[in-house]
Amino acid sequence: MPSFDVISKVSYPEFDNALANCLREIGNRFDFKGLHISIERKDKIITTLAPDELKLKQVNELLQVHLIRRKVDPRVLSIKNSENAAGSSIRQVSELQEGISQENAKKIITEIKKLKLKIQIKIQGEELRAEGKKRDDLQEAMSAITAIDIGLPVEFVNFRD
């Protein structure tokens, strides 16, 4: 019976490379010279420090550009509100989102059931498993899942016949 898994994960080496490239460009850019700007990653938490809101916004846009260049979907970043830090700087804490949450999984399942395809979808922790008799139904489900906007990038793995 053909099946596939739906997952959402982050490639940490690629994310770290994008972060390093972003920091290198920040160090070279003229409009950031002499300013204390930092981006740090500890596990799934990214802390950005900038002197003001405008610079913080520029750093976030720059990080997103570098993520796209390294083929990491920028939707993996869940950006929180900014807060005042020591001195006159502003700190923003972001979180890397991995795995498909229960409510997103239920949303995907209801959308697939609306298509009335002969497939079964099961929630397995933070991923989904879809099984069906026809390969065409599974491929149609894959295209429908990519069309659903859940705010996370999804990948299809373990496609088996």
From Swiss-Prot:
CDD domains: YajQ_like. SUPFAM superfamilies: YajQ-like (SSF89963). InterPro entries: DUF520, UPF0234-like_C, UPF0234_N, YajQ-like_sf. Transmembrane segments: none annotated. Pfam families: DUF520. PANTHER family: UPF0234 PROTEIN YAJQ (PTHR30476:SF0). Belongs to the YajQ family. This is Nucleotide-binding protein SAR11_0692.
